[in-house]
UniProtKB/Swiss-Prot annotation:
Chain intervals with Polar residues compositional bias: 494-504
Protein's UniProt name: Kinesin light chain 3
UniProt keywords, alphabetically: Coiled coil, Cytoplasm, Cytoskeleton, Differentiation, Microtubule, Mitochondrion, Motor protein, Phosphoprotein, Repeat, Spermatogenesis, TPR repeat
Chain's gene name: KLC3
S-S pairs: none
Domain notes: The heptad repeat (HR) motif is sufficient for interaction with kinesin heavy (KHL) chains and ODF1. The TPR region is involved in mitochondrial binding.
Source species taxonomy: Eukaryota, Metazoa, Chordata, Craniata, Vertebrata
Organism: Homo sapiens (Human)
Main location: cytoplasm
Reported function: Kinesin is a microtubule-associated force-producing protein that may play a role in organelle transport. Plays a role during spermiogenesis in the development of the sperm tail midpiece and in the normal function of spermatozoa. May play a role in the formation of the mitochondrial sheath formation in the developing spermatid midpiece.
Amino acid sequence: MSVQVAAPGSAGLGPERLSPEELVRQTRQVVQGLEALRAEHHGLAGHLAEALAGQGPAAGLEMLEEKQQVVSHSLEAIELGLGEAQVLLALSAHVGALEAEKQRLRSQARRLAQENVWLREELEETQRRLRASEESVAQLEEEKRHLEFLGQLRQYDPPAESQQSESPPRRDSLASLFPSEEEERKGPEAAGAAAAQQGGYEIPARLRTLHNLVIQYAGQGRYEVAVPLCRQALEDLERSSGHCHPDVATMLNILALVYRDQNKYKEATDLLHDALQIREQTLGPEHPAVAATLNNLAVLYGKRGRYREAEPLCQRALEIREKVLGADHPDVAKQLNNLALLCQNQGKFEDVERHYARALSIYEALGGPHDPNVAKTKNNLASAYLKQNKYQQAEELYKEILHKEDLPAPLGAPNTGTAGDAEQALRRSSSLSKIRESIRRGSEKLVSRLRGEAAAGAAGMKRAMSLNTLNVDAPRAPGTQFPSWHLDKAPRTLSASTQDLSPH
């Protein structure tokens, strides 16, 4: 119910709408006025009733009755007005109560909304912690699995007594922890004999003797003696045979090896470029010795981190060896291994997997699934998988390598082999024990990556004993053990036994 009143002095300006408080105040004033008016009318009605009761029949009686009726109507109107005013006041009180309740509910809604925001934030934080916990649990389970795998490797460890009796490892210029099978059974004399034929031309006996001396001095770290020896021999060869002679190229290659073992990669690279030019001119661009020199150059470029320049050299060496030796020759597999390592350092993992798969098929076809070269190739491929975070594939390869059929019997187990197999079994046990050490390092890297730790890259050690082999690229006789290559640490570089960085 609303009441419109005209404000004083606002005639002709339209009605003014009162506020609820003003309306209630004026209504109460009206109620007071009506109550006073009702009291007056009750008094007036009483006087009229007394007058009518004491008045006899006369002309004034009719007028009194008429006045009494008017007063009665006024009283009814006053009572009606009072009733409406009371209803208006009650309605106003009810509206006020509703408004107060509305404000209270709004305040409660705001408080609940704020609490809802807090609860939502707490829920998000709880969900985040839950996800982190689930990831941590998954990581710990994976880590536990690989630690169990590392524990299984320990059953093949030699006893502590034999470990203590072994001579301490050399801290010289060896670049790899895994010498090839060929180098393990060759001494300097055997190496010199193997170098008697060098890509179809005869190496003089004096050059072979000099080569053996260089091996000896380089193995002792006496480079101040080895380098002048090489340079003097190189000058003598150039005076006697001229610069463009295969013997000069061989001597350049030997000197490059010495510089490489001193980490003088630039000088070694320059010498190998010279040797490559001589061999291409004297032996032809598709001679196995040219392929070996190309491979050696690729190795040196790889050691200097220039993988993009090394890759085409390695690819050309592969093409020459495929053409000359055949696509299934072990030297082709070695070259594929080097090419895979170069691609791996450039992040070309599809090419890496393809090259390793082909090398693996060559070694399996030549030596069967138990050939140590097969295990080493699988280890290289597993390392590539680790770099791609393909932990499952890497672990499967490691387990294949460590399968019981591929491993020698643990130390202390009964020996059922014949006496004639003892030397070969010993070499095989030594080689596979080194593979196990490489696998253990790979698994430790895997666990470290799961823990978010960066695997510390070991400082590369040079390899003077690689001077011990003058690689012969002619086809090998059936049954000859093919040279194996080395498995190295991250960051991965071309290993010494795959480098063919020899004086051919």
